[in-house]
Amino acid sequence: TDDHLWTIEIKKYPRLAEVGSVRRNADGSIHRGFYTQEQIKEVVAYAAERYITVIPEVELPGHALAALTAYPEYSCTGGPFELRNKWGVEDNVYCAGNDKTFEFLQDILEEVIPLFPGKFFHIGGDECPKVRWNECPKCQKRIKNENLKDAHELQSYFIHRIEKIILAHGKSMIGWDEILEGGLAPSATVMSWRGEEGGIAAASMGHDVIMTPVSYTHLRAHETLAN
């Protein structure tokens, strides 16, 4: 899941796939498509036969625009939104001050987690701008009521609540290195993508780390400009 697409069927919230999997590209063309839960099971089984474990990622609290386009009530502003069709980071994220947001995410996780028998579940946690939270009365009330210092600690609060759901289902949580900000969730494995520093910091606190610095391991570019 991301700002650009939601690509898995959630039976309790059908608009996630119906709306979140359809994007109008910058050139006017339409990109669409999602996996049904049965298709996910087929992919997981195919991978397992080849000794590959598929690890799902449901991005939160940021990179959530596809979900918020389908269900804008879980944002800070109420929308309306459109799926992002260009590079960049989206300011609109899940509202951390709304308890209904956590109910929504728990329902989603309880459908997704059983589809993936592996040990790990990735929650993203990266690139979550705080501009909406800083302006949102509900989020500011949450910060006050939970005795949090700022929006960075609010993100940590958010991740901790999600971690409890994941642990209750017998999974271990993975998140990008931004989950270090405001205090790291106790069981988290950190994927350090912005460099090596986050991984070193997490390891020094006794956490498992996966080093994925963007300069070396994000294989999304051609080998040379000529290609």
Task: Give the ranges of each region predicted by the language model.
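Substrate-binding cleft/loops of secretory-pathway carbohydrate-active enzymes
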Residues: E178-M205, L219
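Short, intrinsically disordered, charge-balanced linker/junction segments flanking boundaries
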Residues: V209, A226-N227
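Active-site-proximal beta-strand/loop segments in catalytic clefts of secreted hydrolases
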Residues: E59, G125-D126, D177-I179, W193, ...
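Conserved small/polar residues in nucleotide/adenosyl-binding loops
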Residues: T217-T224
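Generic recognition of flexible, low-complexity loop/linker segments
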Residues: E110-V112, I162-E163, D177-I179, E197-G199
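Hydrophobic faces of well-ordered beta-strands that scaffold small-molecule active sites
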Residues: P56, F121, M173-G175, V190-M191, ...
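Acidic, contiguous N-terminal accessory segments
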Residues: I165-L180, L184
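Substrate-binding cleft of carbohydrate-active enzyme catalytic domains
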Residues: T1-H169
